[in-house]
Amino acid sequence: MNTAQSALQPEQLTAAGFAPFGIVVEPFAAPGQPGALPPAGARAINGGTTWRLDLTHNLELDHAGGKPGLAVYSASARQFPMALKVLERHAAGSQSFLPLTGARFVVVVAAPGPAPAAAALRAFITTGQQGVVLNPGTWHHALLAVEAGSFAVLERHPSTAGSGADCEFTALAAAVWLALPGADV
């Protein structure tokens, strides 16, 4: 790595840290488990054996004639450190990444608005039990799997030819190096 280039190390993904960019989706204890408390807004279903927490208020999938699209991505593990060169965003809809196989991933994001500078980037590493819902317009890097795994991806798809694709790309002015915690950069 050229030390004159920017270096970015991910922080642990938390709901508070990720709030400007979207929400964190993570498991919580089921009824009857030791210390189990329902998260705020959850309700009991299935005769009290299950807590349900609806997150649909954070999903934007039908803007401008779009419709929900659910896909499964099978991602290879990335090699770190790695150079980040391009970001993307989906201005008309949210995008969710939910690990199906326990694979950790890094999510690199920047606030909606004009194409971001390197200093505006934030990186978060998941536990493998956490997913994210990106707010519409949030700049982000493509999926960065730490371990190979499968992910459910829920996003807005155009419903007709006229409703348009919803993916804009921007090149970073200079490569930003991403390294995992404890790795040499």
Model-derived regions: residue spans:
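Non-catalytic, conserved peripheral segments adjacent to functional cores
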Residues: 1-123, 158-185
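Residues that flank catalytic or metal-binding motifs in active/ligand-binding sites
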Residues: 93, 130, 147
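Conserved metal-binding segment of the jelly-roll/cupin
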Residues: 125-144
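A short beta-strand-loop micro-motif that forms or neighbors metal/cofactor-
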Residues: 138-171
